[in-house]
Amino acid sequence: MNISRREFLSGGAAFAALPKFAALAELTSKGRSYSVPVLGDIHFDSPDPKFYHTDYTHSTSQKRYKAHLAEHVRNSEMWKERSPRLVRASGACLRKDAAFALQMGDLVQGDCGNAATHRRMLDDAFAFVKGAYGGNLPLVTVAGNHDIRGDIDGDGARETLEKWLPETMAKELGVPVAGTTFSFRQGPDVFIVVDFNEPRPNLATIKRLLEESKDARYTFIVSHGPVIPSGQTRWFLMGRKTRDVERKELRSLFARRNAICLCGHTHKLEFYDCEFPEGRISQFVFNSVWSKPEWGTTKVLGEGAAAYGRHRFGDAGNGLGAKSDAELLAEYTSAVRGYCFAEAAGHYRLEVSDAGVSVAFYGGDATTPSRTFQLK
């Protein structure tokens, strides 16, 4: 059954009125074993494609403006029924050992045209997702590119997100959060949340957070943009050619920590197991943008180390063109031990214990997992 615009919005208001949550610090009694429900990008929007976007313009490119309008129509179709079902299914699968919930950025579509509407969209989206988990489970999100997207001339979208995110995360985590890159502890583990939107990724800040948590059992890197590039060789953490030196140093630092990278952005399901000279990096890319009904069922496009780099989509070139892409991917090819690349949308459960770390994938609004990936 489709939900009406009124039902959709009143649901968000009801979720916003739920009782206050417990701080994360109060939940660490779950100890060394816990689960985390995870959503990838969701591009929260209204069934009415104009509801949040009435004031949006793109003053320098009509081509991009028309492309963005098409995204609003796509979102309105998703958010009439499929996307709410997916989010609620994640809540229905919540386990008693859940420590917090994680959303991988692009919480919202953006493109609001003014700061007030952008803030309302963030608040509505957060309330909707948090409500799906009952209102009491802490919800952590990371800055995505759509979370700061507005008119290229500036409509306050980035400034709104950069104020909203630290304030909201501080309330959820029960600890001070100074910016859009921060860390928190869950039992013996550390989660380092990185804002990948240029020019925000700061190597010194990430190095400090790594140093402060060097006693962690597992080091999780939470970044909207992937750390290991594949199908989109420009949109990844420190992916600009001007940041090659920093990118390589960051890769080395993460490998030394045997980091587990949790990412989004590509609207694909992706799994990586990479062995570098300094150590191992595991990466999982989550997608919850259910833009096509058939994406509720997994379609694997490539699997196994030999498939890495074969499936390309979106912006290419790392700013320089196809030859540069090949050179970039060659830095990673020899390190890849395990790989999966699929068209799929759904919700996920991260499972963490002394025995290892895994991700269970639930296609679409399913309540039983269709596949489990071992990250550690």
Place the predicted regions along the sequence by residue:
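N-terminal export signals
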Residues: 2, 7-26
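N-terminal active-site segment of His-dependent metallophosphoesterases
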Residues: 24-116
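Extended active-site neighborhood of metal-dependent phosphoesterases/phosphodiesterases
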Residues: 27-28, 59-62, 112-218, 236-260, ...
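Short, solvent-exposed loop/turn elements at domain surfaces
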Residues: 36, 44-50, 201-203, 230, ...
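Active-site glycine-centered loops adjacent to acidic/histidine catalytic or metal-binding residues
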Residues: 41, 105-106, 144-145, 224, ...
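C-terminal/domain-terminus segments
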Residues: 103-123, 276-281, 357-376
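Short acidic, glycine-rich surface-loop motifs adjacent to enzyme active sites
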Residues: 215-232
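Histidine-centered catalytic micro-motifs
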Residues: 222-227, 261-269
